[in-house]
């Protein structure tokens, strides 16, 4: 989202006077005279009634009024501005409809970008900004990823508690529209806990697992098991379910669902989507150890009909998690490569062996090229001697 600098031609006193008159004319309970306590008291009074303009004003007119209020706010010293900024942010969350919510969002974004980057108030503005963005379906305009979020607060990082609160909000506003992003947010949230306080993150850990399982684009689930709050769930059904998605095959999930159907449904997980994901994960696991698989093997392992094999493999190839070739004539699937479901010691050893083999091959090639080069030089010298 773009934001323009705030510039108002009138003096502060003149702006305050005009704003007071404007809101009084709209019927707000406010005096048209300036406060003798100073501009901060004026702002408190103005912000207290500023939402009256939401009733009948045009969005463009309201944007101008809010812009004027912001231009005054950013002149207030940091040590005296917190209550003013918080009061304004709270008012901006009260927009009665989507068009006005967009105006409020723009105003908060303007305030956010005009505050000093080292100001701790930016966190509070951003938190409310996300709330308003949800109201007008503009979340991705203000939040595109965790890295972008951290860069916003590089000069004044919020506390762990503040970030946990913000991550929970971001998860809530993205879970219905972008499960992949929501899952990344929850993983980041769990990463803010330490061994000392991980035990209190039970609810967050469960949300993180459910979000990751529900995301149709998240397949590498092994890293979740290493998160401290997730470890505290060992022995719980949700941890057992996660373990199945990490390393077990489809029959294990089917059995779990038969035994704990109510639990799976209570978590908001869709059984058919779970089956689809487990089939893909099972296929990946089979591909790790089998360079080729028959259609008969796939129908048995994936619990699908033979007619469903080809469409299934095509869907797998679209994910780019597996590289393979269909052999319809021989009713086989030939595997070129696959992403591993887990990446532990065996996978590191396999990678080490592969790199060692590459190193040896490169050494052989270099030695061969050296010999060819030496032979060419000898041949050239001999030809010179002959002539």
Curated annotation (Swiss-Prot):
Molecular-function GO term, any one: translation initiation factor activity
Location(s) in or outside the cell: Cytoplasm; Golgi apparatus
Annotated Gene Ontology cellular component terms: cytosol; eukaryotic 43S preinitiation complex; eukaryotic 48S preinitiation complex; eukaryotic translation initiation factor 3 complex, eIF3m; Golgi apparatus; investment cone
InterPro entries the UniProt entry points to: ARM-type_fold (IPR016024), COPS7/eIF3m (IPR045237), eIF3m (IPR027528), eIF3m_C_helix (IPR040750), PCI_dom (IPR000717), WH_DNA-bd_sf (IPR036390)
Example GO BP: Golgi organization
Alphabetically ordered keywords of this record: Cytoplasm, Golgi apparatus, Initiation factor, Protein biosynthesis
Main subcellular localisation: cytoplasm
UniProt xrefs under Pfam families: eIF3m_C_helix, PCI
Family: Belongs to the eIF-3 subunit M family.
Subunit structure: Component of the eukaryotic translation initiation factor 3 (eIF-3) complex. The eIF-3 complex interacts with pix.
Protein name: Eukaryotic translation initiation factor 3 subunit M
Taxonomic source organism: Drosophila ananassae
Gene: Tango7
